[in-house]
Amino acid sequence: MKAAIVTAQGLVLQDVPVPKPGPQQVLIKLRAIGLNRADLGVAAGHQHGPVGGPGTIPGLEGAGEIAECGSEVPSHLKPGMRVMASMGATYAEYALADWGRVSLLPDANMSWEVAATLPIALQTMHNAVVTHGLCAPGSAIMIQGASSGVGLMGLQIARLMGASVVVGSSTNPEKRARLAEFGATLAVDTNDPAWVKQVLDATEGRGVDAVVDQISGPLVSQTLAATRVLGRIINVGRLGGAVADFDFDLHAARRISYIGVTFRTRSNEEVREIVRLMRQDLWAALEAGTLALPLDRVFHLDEVHAALAHMKANAHFGKIAMVTG
């Protein structure tokens, strides 16, 4: 099969053997691949959790047909089924997924490209907004970095679960202007010193119940100030920096729960439960088409360098996909 492999000379397309599924794995013939920002570091040779370095195939999600099932895979999954999944090593024509991460396409007419961009956004944001953010009818929720594909899904999930105030942040004015299309009741520019006041004004001075923070870095103390007493901050990403000054006194005074989440250290059993809960809450909306992400651009796997460059330029809105055929 063709795959993009990390080498000392950079990312190179090579022919490699098709992997064989383990007892609880599904082999998927990939038709499309979703790109995620973590792919940039892996493609450059950096570690991302347990993966990285020469010989690594980047990629975290994709869609295609089941080619083969391991001996312990439940019988509801069968060869030939159209599926999408979060999994590793998806910059290739075939990839392996734990069976618990594999979902049948919610719409028989859904394109491969669209399906490939959904798994990471769905499971990440349901886990952050609902499981850890405790979003419920009447909640006030903020998504930091809301114009990313994952962020746009977070806005939609918050509204779907009944949040009455949904704040999205973006420093790009064109992207910020579009956040209302995806459920934001307030869009703020975190480069504007007044953004915390805007959030407080929208919540009658209390602050939001939960912030799903994809930015972190130097914004973290302002984010504390925008969160209510006994609120929650869910640390999903660190696009603004992994290390920064932190106002410990404000954190204590507001008694905020600061929760770190990542899939890098979760077991298969934990991820299976995350996917199960996501399906329980969101699948009907996916089937109805009320949860969707904009597809910014589609590349071919042969154009992997151009696809990564497009993502690195950060000019896209929504998700980027690659097709294999």
Spans of features found by a protein language model:
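Glycine-rich beta-strand-centered segment in the early N-terminal region that forms part
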Residues: P19-G34, H46-A89
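A structural motif shared across PLP-dependent enzymes of the aminotransferase-like
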Residues: M87-G100
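Short, glycine/polar-rich helix-capping loops at beta-to-alpha or helix-loop-helix junctions
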Residues: T90-E93, S170-R178, V243-F248
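Mid-domain Rossmann-like dinucleotide-binding core that forms the NAD(H)/NADP(H) cofactor-binding site
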Residues: A116-D192
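Short amphipathic alpha-helix with an adjacent loop that forms part of the alpha/beta core around
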Residues: A194-G205
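C-terminal capping/lid region of NAD(P)-dependent oxidoreductase domains
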Residues: G205, W283, A288-R297, H305-G325
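Glycine-rich phosphate-binding loop and adjacent beta-alpha segment
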Residues: P218-T290, V323-G325
